[in-house]
């Protein structure tokens, strides 16, 4: 497992961004699950950091046709930019 640096800012003090790998998105039933999923996706891309992280949520309704009622579901999304950074000496 890579030590993943995560930040809501677009810069990391003491580090320089050497490569931008792209947008990453994770989702889950709570903010922590969404962030964990985001980190897994970034690791698979070869990133060692994710910058500009934002978390949002969406309320949807699942219709249960057999029982004729709706169940609300809240899904959290985490998104940011996967990057490779190097420590500045």
Curated annotation (Swiss-Prot):
It holds the Pfam family YbjQ_1. Belongs to the UPF0145 family. Highly divergent. This is UPF0145 protein MJ1170. It comes from Methanocaldococcus jannaschii (strain ATCC 43067 / DSM 2661 / JAL-1 / JCM 10045 / NBRC 100440) (Methanococcus jannaschii).
């Amino acid at each position: 497992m890579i030590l993943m640096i995560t930040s809501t800012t677009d810069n990391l003090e003491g580090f320089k961004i050497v490569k931008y790998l792209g947008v990453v998105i994770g989702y889950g039933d709570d903010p922590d699950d969404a962030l964990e999923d985001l980190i897994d996706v970034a690791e698979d891309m070869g990133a060692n950091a994710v910058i500009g992280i934002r978390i949002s949520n969406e309320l949807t309704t699942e219709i249960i046709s057999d029982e004729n009622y709706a169940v609300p579901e809240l899904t959290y999304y985490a998104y940011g930019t996967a990057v490779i950074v190097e420590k500045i000496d």
